[in-house]
Every structure is written in structure tokens, then in C-alpha cells.
């Protein structure tokens, strides 16, 4: 089973197919043109519908555009489980993140604490995207913000050394 990362942008959509793992392997990369005028979600829908028909991706990880999402990096004391969820939620509220939000753990160390990447997008945008995925049968398993991708890349680069 291959993974596909799709990066939404106003001017185009980037798609990379490959295998996830300790050392990810990219097998194909595509730049999908998008009309630069009109409703962005409708333009993405047209482009992704065609891509989906041609490539039939198994698992899609979607990265939201920078201008449609927000991301915050924060450090909290070392906790796990329910405490981690509660602290991350409080941090997102304190930072004024609006809409729907989630977080991922970038690093965790008992002495240094937990480094979180908190991302959010408006509920309206996420609803439009969810409706679009369902309509074109695109198997999206994960939605992320660009900052999380950068951080994962940096952690992969450290793992190579």
C-alpha cells in the first residue's frame, strides 16, 4: 500500500506518492495545475477529481495551504495521555486558535518537556473539504498544516545522521 501526500495551494496542487517509513521512499511527484480564479475549493475539486481517477491513491495525507490554516509551536512540561490532551487544548485556547484545532507531538523529553505543533483551520473550510473528499471518493486519512510537515522533515533528517 502506498501513501500519497497532497499539498493544496492556490496556484497548484503538489502530490507525492511513495512509502512511509523510517526512511521514506518517494516514487512519483506531480504538479497539478489549478485555475487561479474562482472558488479555491471548487478548483481543487476539479483537479483532485481528475487526479483521483488517473492514480487511485490508497491513503492520502492532505496538507492545508498556509493562508487557510494556522500553526503554533509551543513547549509544555512533560506529561502524557489525558493530561497531554488537556494541556495541548489549553495552549491552543490561550493562543487564540480559532476553528477546529489539533496538535502533534514534535518531541518529548522528561527534562525538556514536550514540544507541540498546534494547527487549526476554520470549521467552514474543513466541512467544505470533507464534503469534497466524499463527493470525489478521495481517501483522506490525515489533514495537516505545513509547519508539521517541515518539523517531520527535520526529524527525518536528524534520523539519517
Write out the residue ranges for each language-model feature.
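Short alpha-helical segments and helix-capping/turn motifs at coil-helix boundaries
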Residues: 1, 45-49, 126
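Buried hydrophobic packing residues in well-ordered domains
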Residues: 15, 62, 91-92, 133
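Internal amphipathic helical hairpin motif
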Residues: 64-119, 151, 157-158
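Amphipathic alpha-helical regulatory segments at dimerization interfaces
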Residues: 47-51, 91, 132
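N-terminal phosphate-binding loop and adjacent alpha-helix
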Residues: 26-52
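Short glycine-rich phosphate-binding loop at a beta-alpha junction
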Residues: 48, 53-68, 141-144
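Short amphipathic alpha-helical segments
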Residues: 40-44, 80-84, 121, 125
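Small-residue (GG/TT-enriched) beta-loop-alpha framework at ligand/catalytic clefts
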Residues: 2-25, 31, 54, 110-161
Amino acid at each position: 500500500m502506498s501513501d500519497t501526500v497532497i499539498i493544496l495551494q492556490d496556484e497548484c496542487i503538489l502530490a507525492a506518492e511513495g512509502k512511509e517509513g523510517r526512511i521514506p521512499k518517494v516514487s512519483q511527484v506531480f504538479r497539478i495545475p489549478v485555475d487561479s480564479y474562482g472558488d479555491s475549493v471548487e478548483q481543487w475539486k476539479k483537479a483532485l477529481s481528475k487526479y483521483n481517477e488517473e492514480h487511485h491513491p490508497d491513503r492520502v495525507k492532505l496538507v492545508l495551504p498556509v493562508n487557510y490554516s494556522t500553526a503554533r509551536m509551543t513547549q509544555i512540561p512533560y506529561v502524557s495521555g489525558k493530561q497531554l490532551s488537556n494541556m495541548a487544548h489549553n495552549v491552543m485556547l490561550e493562543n487564540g486558535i480559532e476553528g477546529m484545532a489539533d496538535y502533534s507531538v514534535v518531541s518529548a523529553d522528561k527534562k525538556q518537556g514536550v514540544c507541540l505543533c498546534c494547527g487549526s483551520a476554520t470549521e467552514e473550510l474543513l466541512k467544505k473539504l470533507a464534503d469534497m473528499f466524499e463527493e470525489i471518493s478521495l481517501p483522506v486519512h490525515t489533514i495537516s498544516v505545513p509547519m508539521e510537515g517541515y518539523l517531520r522533515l527535520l526529524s527525518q533528517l536528524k534520523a539519517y545522521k
